[in-house]
Amino acid sequence: MDQDEALTTVDNIVTQFNTYEDFLDSQITTLDLYYLEDEGLARQLVELGYRGTGEVVKREDFEARKAAIEIARLAERTQKKTLTSAGKDLHDNFLKALAVREEDNRSGKSVIFIRDKNSHGQEVSGYIDYAHRLKTEDFEVYFSGKKRLLPRPTDMSFYNWDSHIAIWNSTPNYQVIADNPEGLLFKYKRDRKILNVDPKAQPGDNSTRSPILTELYTQVVIFDHVSRRKT
């Protein structure tokens, strides 16, 4: 038997049996148990090749192939992971804009500015690291319309216009520069480019500013950044 045939045989066995012990048991006959009177001993003899009705497969080969097949299965499932926005009937421009950017933001691309009233009727605004929020919460509730995406005190920036509370937080993708005399800046950590969110200024290298007309919020602006750094 050549190497390819041997590998195919092991793969077939690994696919058929959950554990190595299950495979050994399949090779033991009723007659073996009658004469040996010990299931453990019967398994050992099959493993050593002295008993059995089929191919001899070493424990380490079985477990190695089992692990490799599982890793490949998980990798394939990750690659085929359905986007949260997939299949949703989205009518509002903001939700459509989020859906278009969802796949890119699995690696960190966009900053979302939102201004609107919270559940207490207070006006709040802030900048959201879209990629970070995607990783830390389920966006199903937003795309399905069950909840509205709003800035939180844990986002890149948060401001409550009633209480005048202002909070800034750096994220895995962006460093907040809050002490800039000309206004708030964000530095993209991957390529260290500056994103300027001042509406009167250019957003910066490799960045675009897109105001979104939406019926869900008072104001929405999405900043998209394209990293030129090789990864």
From Swiss-Prot:
It is found in: Cytoplasm; Nucleus. It holds the Pfam family DUF4464. May be involved in spermatogenesis. One of its GO terms (cellular component) is cytoplasm. This is Cilia- and flagella-associated protein 299. It comes from Bos taurus (Bovine). The gene is CFAP299. Keywords: Cytoplasm, Nucleus.
